[in-house]
Amino acid sequence: PQPAAAAHPPMELTYRPRRLRRTPALRAMVRETQLSAADFIYPLFVHEGATNEPIGAMPGCQRWSLDGLVQEVGRAWDLGIRCVVLFPKVADGLKTEDGAECFNEGGLIPRAIRRLKEVHPGMTIMTDVALDPYSCDGHDGIVSGEGVVLNDETVALLCRQAVAQARAGADLIGPSDMMDGRVGAIREALDEEGFEHVGIISYTAKYASAYYGPFREALDSAPRAAAGKPIPKDKSTYQMDPANAREAITEAQLDEQEGADIMMVKPGLAYLDIIHRLREESELPIAAYNVSGEYAMVKAAAEKGWIDERAVVLETLLCFKRAGADLILTYHACDAAAWLRQG
């Protein structure tokens, strides 16, 4: 139907952008960005326990038992999600200064990978490469007696960790440690062991952010003081300064030269400008990590009734793609996939 006659003559406008916003069908026809379940990578926490444990700071998330993990990955598959990333909650008794449990081929993550590949062979399995879940110091690298996070010594251990994960069946290795040169070293180590087919999704621009708090609670992986040993109180000597943008381009160029297959920006929501810059600079796929703090804020506001959770989540995920991300790591993955299916 034609709109009611205007009370005064129409303005003489050559182009009216609202013409293409008039109906849902028209808006869908000219929509520039599309969101689908295939865009999501679903982060999952796993522990040695026989039952699943709710994570207080991340409502709706669990530390999954191996049986629970298998069931949850099956649910994700049924919703159209095709990639999960695994993070271990390691028992304190297995944590050491060098994090050697990280390359134990009988450890939690290798067993979880093998189990998932047996039951859900089509699911893409991404893993995390860093020492912090395995370190009694809570850092991504080895901490010297002087309180310095050692780069090259750490990279040697990360290579062993990556190979152990690949041997278990991992499809994508995700170095989140932010040590210099680790992408090239891991690529070389994988190739030498016959894992040329295993990809690297590098945490290229990982910022020393305040948005990681709930994640560290989930894994008990925050830096911690040790008797008689100075421990850096944060990760600012290896993760990026939130004030820097050009530095992200340098990191991206290095990762691409060293053989990264996919590059990631973490956190995502407060760093949409970085996602956009990397998209302009590189032809590699770009991933954005919708991190635990971002997730927790949405959940808390939704619980109070202050926001429409469904609308806010889908808008947030769409914004990552609009900024230039091809893939999105998000704890909202299953909810978002279900909402997209509902239309």
Regions found by a protein language model. Name each.
Residues 1-10:
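Short, Lys/Arg-enriched N-terminal segments with co-localized hydrophobic residues
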Residues 10-31:
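N-terminal amphipathic/basic leader segments beginning at the initiator methionine
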Residues 23, 35-41, 47-343:
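Alpha/beta enzyme core
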